Amino acid sequence: MALWTSSYPVDTGDRDPSFAWPDTDVPSAGLDESQHDLFAQFLDFEAGHGSTSSATVAVAEPFYMDPSHHHHHPHHHAHGESSTTSSGVSNADEFDFLSSSSNPGAAGYDVDPSTLAMFAQDPAAMYSTTSGVTVSDTELERLEGISLHSPKKGDGTFADRAASPTPVAAPAIAVNATTNAANTTTNARRSKKIVDALSSTFRKATTMRKTRKVSQTLQRAVSPSMENPPMAIKPGSAQSAAPVPRGRRAHRAHTQHALQHQQQQHQHQQQQAHQISESPPILQINTGLANSGGFVAGQFEDPFGGEISPTHAPQPQSQPPQMRYYSQGGLGTPLDSPTRSAAMLQQQWQQQQQQQHNGAQQHQWSAASSQQELWWGGAAGGGAIEAKNIDANMAMHSQHGELPYDVHADAGRVAPNGLLIHMPQPRPGSSSVHDLSLNAHTYLPPPPPVPTENTRSARPPRAPSSGARHHHRTTSSSPMRKQRGTSVSPSPGGNGSGGGTRQSRHSSGGSAASSSQRSASGRVSVPGTPSSSGIKKRRSRDAGSGSFSADEAGGFTLVGGGGGGGGGGGGGGIGFVNFTPNDGGVLMTGVAPSGSSKTKARREKEAQERRRRLSEAAMKAVAAAGGDIRKLREQGFEL
């Protein structure tokens, strides 16, 4: 057995009686007052594993005494020797880190070299001479094997994490038991926190490294795919840490999966072919050909015999099966379960039955097709009807450009909002136009609504900003004037609505335009009835459009005329008075001039822009519907 010793020199001046280690007191050490075993928290001979039996080492010296006991009770040394040797540890009351011998004035801590030489020759003499320190060979080996792991005992014991003592070759260096014990206690206490931090760091690093290795291994081994199905791996076993070999075994498994997948696809296709053969053919109408064929002006010629139109012929059954299924055989398509072996045998038996019935089914198909062709009677004339409809639509488009909006059929129709809103209709003529109904692409936008009678009250004369400001002020005897021949042109066939007394109304408009929109070819007609008291005033862009003519349908058509105009009606007929610059005195009596002409010009410009946008939208709609814009322009449609 070898004895390792080290020196801890301390000057005499440093021995302060009030000196105390702050970390070794009971409250700072984290111990209860009833727990006085301080050495037990620093030494753990089992290395925190509990695999070896605990050993008791007496590291306390008989000199650990209270200073008061040291001076007044010299006989306490022997008692300290017996108590510390028998118990293996010392109580807190016996600690004295300042007095190392019976002589308080001793300044040295060295031991006689002759004693060390005797210990080197006869190690057993050390146990007989120094009864305070007794360490056996097995206990010394346990001290050398102390690990840095934290103790796992719950009684507050901690492993001694101080560095192992290094052998010193100089025999002249001795150790003092009191200083050595104090040094061990102090170093263990001070290094406790550092060693705890280091051990926790090692533990975290080791745990993270192990966890990372296991997770990487699992990710490599468990990553599923269509060729390599996932394998059950136990995370705790040692075999799971090794990656799955990817050699001939993996290649063989991949080949087997590919062959199985191809076989299942082939069987699935055969099953689909069998199901198709058992069902009769379906007559599918090709809507694309039916719609596009309508633009052909003429009768269809059937190249197959004339019984059925080619647009309604049955579709051939030569479509490849793999085209009907999206992403067949891809990663998102699940494989068929291998437990369906009985179903596969049944499919093979059905395929054999299919081959026997092919001849009879083909005969049945031909008979069924001929019967289904006969009951649908509209197959032969469908293309002609489509072509006829297209021609009629083109004719109606051409008529809209040159016709005024003559609404006699919709004159009495009241919209849900209570206003008389009409739809543009073609001139009564060919019967093919009457058989058609307008859709969203064939009619122009409707005009603005016309207010009802309760909104058309008589108004006083307005400001000259309404468009009737003129410099030629010729006095007029009365607003009731006879009709001038050049301003009114009643339409032939009128039923007296154009004649009669002309009752004028003080109109504030420079020209009383209709409340409908203007087409590109001229003024448009508005819905009206003989019982209406008047029409709503609209400012006109030019002053030469104030004359009106009444037709037999009750609509009003602007035909051109003199200057500003005012409209009025009442009694049994509808009459109009055309105001001229000579009537300026009547229209501008008591009215101060204003600068509303700018507003008038701005509004007229906005109306013109609105009409232009509507016309462009109509042309775009016609072009989108497949019409010929050039022909429409030739017929009268212009942007």
From Swiss-Prot:
Polar residues: bias regions: 81-90, 214-226
Key words of the record: Activator, Conidiation, Sporulation, Transcription, Transcription regulation, Virulence
Traits of the deletion mutant: Leads to slower germination, lower hydrophobivity and lower virulence of conidia.
Top-rank taxon: Eukaryota
Composition-biased stretches (Basic residues): 69-78, 246-255
Ranges of biased composition (kind: Low complexity): 256-275, 346-369, 506-526
GO biological process: conidium formation; sporulation resulting in formation of a cellular spore
Region (Disordered): 65-97, 206-369, 418-552, 587-613
PANTHER family: DEVELOPMENTAL REGULATORY PROTEIN WETA, PROTEIN ESC1/WETA-RELATED
Family assignment from sequence similarity: Belongs to the wetA family.
Function: BrlA, abaA and wetA are pivotal regulators of conidiophore development and conidium maturation. They act individually and together to regulate their own expression and that of numerous other sporulation-specific genes. Acts as a crucial regulator of both conidiation capacity and conidial quality. Plays a role in virulence.
Protein name listed in UniProt: Developmental regulatory protein wetA
Organism this protein belongs to: Beauveria bassiana (strain ARSEF 2860)
